[in-house]
């Protein structure tokens, strides 16, 4: 059912947006990794999921699971609910388990959507997850206004190891890794 729903969503999206994807060859065929993208619209996870060959287990704010149809889709794609007040240990544990099971975790380093042109604040959670799993990160940049019939450009960078695995990581390491990942995401957007 998952594949059928993704195909239907892709057809729907192709009717309202002109999606152009660069770097699909950079998406690993197997193994756990963290797909990290900028977050400008509620369309972002759908644009990424319908154009990437791997199933992505996105982290999504818990409030979305209270909206009937949205909740149904999120449960179908096995999104991980995240409580936004403070740190959500259950969500972090689920994210780590997802990656260690060989799956792709989708995460937006700034958390909630950033307004157009605003970068938002990079959260350290992605650095924490990268250190705990020793998983590579796959930077993705979306450039779009998401107006009807507009062009949506998705640039996928190369997978990179952001944690060297040496020593015990600190809170500063988590912040540094998160910022490096976000810098790579922004760099992908400079060509648009």
Regions found by a protein language model. Give the residues of each.
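N-terminal nucleotide/polyanion-binding subdomain common to many enzyme families
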Residues: 3-12
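Short, glycine/polar-rich helix-capping loops at beta-to-alpha or helix-loop-helix junctions
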Residues: 5, 65-70, 147-149
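Catalytic core of membrane glycerolipid acyltransferases/transacylases, capturing the structured
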Residues: 14, 27-86
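Short gly/ser/thr-rich secondary-structure transition/capping motifs
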Residues: 14-22
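Structural motif corresponding to alpha-helix initiation and N-cap regions
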Residues: 21-24, 67, 89-92
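Short, basic, glycine/proline-bearing loop/turn elements
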Residues: 9, 76-81, 109-112
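Non-catalytic C-terminal accessory region of glycerolipid acyltransferases
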Residues: 90-192
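Short amphipathic alpha-helix with an adjacent loop that forms part of the alpha/beta core around
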Residues: 25-28, 96-97
């Amino acid at each position: 059912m998952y594949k059928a729903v993704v195909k239907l969503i892709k057809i729907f999206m192709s009717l309202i947006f002109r999606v152009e994807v660069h770097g699909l060859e950079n998406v690993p065929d197997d193994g756990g990794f963290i797909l990290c993208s900028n977050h400008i619209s509620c369309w972002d996870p759908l644009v990424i999921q319908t154009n990437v060959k791997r199933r992505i287990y996105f982290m999504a704010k818990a409030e979305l699971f209270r909206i009937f149809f949205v909740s149904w889709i999120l449960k179908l794609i096995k999104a991980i609910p995240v409580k936004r007040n403070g740190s959500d240990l259950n969500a972090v544990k689920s994210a780590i388990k997802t990656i260690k099971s060989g799956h792709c975790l989708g995460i937006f380093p700034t958390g909630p959507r950033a307004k157009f042109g605003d970068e938002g604040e990079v959260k350290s959670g992605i650095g924490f997850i990268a250190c705990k799993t020793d998983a590579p990160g796959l930077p993705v940049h979306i450039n779009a206004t998401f107006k009807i019939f507009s062009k949506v450009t998705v640039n996928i960078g190369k997978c990179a190891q952001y944690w060297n695995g040496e020593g015990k990581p600190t809170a500063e390491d988590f912040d540094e890794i998160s910022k490096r990942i976000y810098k790579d995401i922004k760099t992908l957007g400079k060509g648009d």
